[in-house]
Amino acid sequence: MDSDDDYNGPADTNPRLEDEESDLDEKYPNRPRNHSTTLPFHVLFQTLFYPLSEIKKKPAGPARKKVGPHGLSSVNLTPLEKRRDIIDRFISRWRKEVGDDIYPAFRLILPDKDRDRAMYGMKEKAIGKLLIRIMKIDKNSEDALNLLNWKLPGQTTTSSMAGDFAGRCFGVLSKRPMRTEVGDMTIEEVNEKLDHLSAASKENQQLPILTEFYRRMNPEELMWLIRIILRQMKVGATERTFFDVFHPDAENLYSISSSLRRVCWELHDPNIRLEAEDRGITLMQCFQPQLAQFQMHSLDRMISRMRLTEDDPVFWIEEKLDGERMQLHMDSNDSVPGGRTFRFWSRKAKDYTYLYGNGIQDENGALTRYLSDAFADGVESLILDGEMITWDTEQDAIAPFGTLKTAALSEQRNPYSSTTRPLFRIFDILYLNGRDLTRYTLRDRRNALQKSIKPVYRRFEIHPYEEATGKTEIEEALRRVVEEASEGLVLKNPRSPYRLNERHDDWMKVKPEYMTEFGESLDVVVIGGYYGSGHRGGGLSSFLCGLRVDDAHSSQGMVASKCYSFCKVGGGFTAADYANIRHHTDGKWHEWKSRKPPTTYIELAGGDAQYERPDMWIKPEDSVVLCVKAASVAVSDQFRIGLTLRFPRFKKLRMDKDWKSALSVQEFLDLKANAERERKEKEFNVDNSRKKRAKRDNKKPLAIVGYSAEAEAQYTGPSGNIFEGLNFYITTDSNTPVKKSKAELEQLVKANGGKFFQTSNAAPSTICIADRRTVKAASLQKSGNVNIIRPSWILDCIRQSEIDAGLPDSLLPLEPRHVFFATQDKKEEIAASVDRFNDSYARNTTNDELKEILKQMSKDHHFHASQNPKIVRKLNERIQEKVNAGWEMPSGWLFKGLTILFPQNDKVDDAEVDETSQTHQQYRLNLARNTVRFAGANVVDSKSSSVTHIVVAPGSSSSDVSSIRKSHSAKPGKKVPHLVTAEWIEECWKQRTLLGEEGFQPSRGT
């Protein structure tokens, strides 16, 4: 049971726990009771976690050391069926040997879904420190350093599991276990101790509890216990799989209640289904909200997912807010002061009622005290979905998300002195006066919201949206987002219902930071400023920037200090940046007067129309220089250059430069020409990192994907933290894939957080680097106990860190190509990072690497891999999982599952087409056949009951079309295949998605 008290010893001595148990009996009078003691803790990983993890592993690579107990009996099952079988066996055993209350086990199996146990407040480093104390290890020893620096790769077996804290703990614990055999702790005992641990807030309270675990568990048990504490199980099965096996209504009940306890206790009998009235959301019961799908590779594809119709061809655009997702429940209650009761829950089901208030007259509520007149007459109860943000009353703008809790606490203490306050922005209503609205369309729900709420200015407001029909509106909205430094956009389908606990295409995120930046940083001069509105109101929030006019673009006699307008920059500024700009330009701004523009200093586009004219202007000689980056360069008649930056973002203020050393018009044109020679300019490209992460998951769930050839050519040495805490001894320069001197490699290490030394033993866990056999390298190799890594690993890690900007830093695992010399115990781990053709599981190969891999592959290998039905079936399942989660369909899988019939002899009516046309039509048909065959379709040339599509030859006569229609007319119980032209295949391939067949049917008149 939960407890907010400090650890006080056994649970049965705590009266509060007894009271909580009594309350639970009252709340769940029909709760199940177990007839026997719970199973031993070790049964969880022996019969559940390990077998599930074995299915998760990829069959390629070295032989597996462990085989699940059901491996032989489930050979012919799909991975999903195997997972279900393992889970079902465990649940059946529990019901037979323990009883119907499986909640104690599920709390440990799905710890991240257990909202009834408080967070432990313990991260990896805190656990590592406690283990060092418990095992009495010297804090400067190698094992202690391995625990504290668990993200770093090491040279020994103990430290080899970089990034897996629990695995590294296992290595250290195995050297000094209290017991080697599994312990005798039951699942119930473990839960009891974990309840105490979650209530312990100080290290001296946590230490005796972990010591008890250490005394009674072996290293393997402790490894899984640590994963439970960190809520990082990763056993190869999601909660949906567990719920689905446990009870057909389990996932639905969890979605509407967020309560693992309620799922286990109310659905303990799989034969009793939820009543219809129990399947919807309930007032004062936290539910799992709908989430927005991740951004796809193109706006056109995203718009297609909005399912526009001829009668209703619109979708909605909302600003994505930088706050905390929050649901508000309100119920009328005459027995409480103010007549209304409130509850607040976050997306993670954390109760925030204590912070925002439980009633109109709750003096500790940072929000509810202002809501006495916030609801329309007749509104008795409702549930609202929205975002809690921080509002800066002085700037009249959104404040950073990290200040939300501080603002709420400040509002609690003194509502009159605070400059920031919580603001609840509402974008949906899901329940109104006893009626569940989730099945209604978003448009209908919005109408209900407008009629139910009376906004309270800057405290309780309805989030606005705008209607759109195409990507032009999205691009324009993105420009505003960047200018105002907002979070991003959300596209919504107004015809959609609300989907509980689901990330669906009806809502899709668009964030400007996903976009590929124009490769160079540009130093531009501020020549104008625009007053902000909304979030950035009250001051100059965005700036007009210009390029210095040089001799090549100056008119005769023109003043040298003139600038051409080039772009508007409003994204990326912090409050400190704005203050710094104000400080250096104070008193130098002038109001822009349209009738008397300052053409001596600034030239806009449009002549007298004065395109993009600013509110204020400043002389270039009085101004500052900004360093900006952008998505790309685009043609524009809105700026004097004729070009502009798409989605520019401020990087830093260049106080080391003045307007004379800023970028000139000619310098920019030269820079653009050079960039275009290196790569073709792309419009509105989504960052490759998302696509590459999708490919990574289709191979093997290791740490990181690799770098691209393009990144290799452009790389100039970014700064980062990928090597933070690592020590390097670099003995040679780099020969491949690019030449780098020893000094350059050392500077790269330093620039990315690492340290370098000139001897191998100057610091603990030093990584030795060499690319050729020198005296130093030979000496290290001769010792036989040091791994020597090639410089290519450093370069690969840095490039990947740059690609994955914004994601947690994680080092690439070592591949054979990265290793100059490896110790015997390291060789197996290194070999496991690639397949038999040396194709990395964790890194995308470059074009040159792929060519070499293909050269090594024999035809027999190719045939074996492509024809193995188990491999194909497994690959199909994994690809489908990713596509369902929003990833782009791989090109080679586009027509997978379809059976397509092509006409025999590919004949056309000779009377209707000449020889040249017939040859072209024959070519189109052959190309269509090869395309679908490549993209996974089953191509047939004769009638079959499994045919899904029939391709009609170009130029077919009306009689041919009629004959085909007649021969494939529907029979009872059979579906009619689609008749399509070759154009359907061509367009599907072009759009990389399966299009509707309706627009590609052969004409009835042909």
UniProtKB/Swiss-Prot annotation:
Listed cofactors: Mg(2+)
Main location: nucleus
Described purpose of this protein according to its UniProt entry: DNA ligase involved in DNA non-homologous end joining (NHEJ); required for double-strand break (DSB) repair.
One of the GO biological process terms: double-strand break repair via classical nonhomologous end joining
Ranges where the BRCT domain occurs: 718-811, 890-1002
NCBIfam families with a match to the protein in the record: dnl1
Residue sites binding Mg(2+) 1 per the record: 387
Family statement drawn from the similarity comment of this UniProt entry: Belongs to the ATP-dependent DNA ligase family.
Entry annotation: catalytic residues: 320
Domain of life (superkingdom): Eukaryota
Residues noted as binding ATP in the record, renumbered to the chain: 318, 320-321, 325, 387, 427, 487, 492, 509, 511
Top-level EC class: ligase
Protein name (record): DNA ligase 4
Pfam family, one: BRCT_2
Compartments in which it is found: Nucleus
Listed EC numbers: 6.5.1.1
GO CC annotation, single: nucleolus
Binding site for Mg(2+) 2: 487
Residue ranges of the region described as Disordered: 1-36
Matches recorded under Gene3D superfamilies: BRCT domain, DNA ligase, ATP-dependent, N-terminal domain, DNA ligase/mRNA capping enzyme, Nucleic acid-binding proteins
Keyword Transmembrane: no
Signal sequence, start to end: none
Catalyses which reaction(s): ATP + (deoxyribonucleotide)n-3'-hydroxyl + 5'-phospho-(deoxyribonucleotide)m = (deoxyribonucleotide)n+m + AMP + diphosphate
Gene Ontology molecular functions: ATP binding; DNA binding; DNA ligase (ATP) activity; metal ion binding
Keywords, alphabetical: ATP-binding, DNA damage, DNA recombination, DNA repair, Ligase, Magnesium, Metal-binding, Nucleotide-binding, Nucleus, Repeat
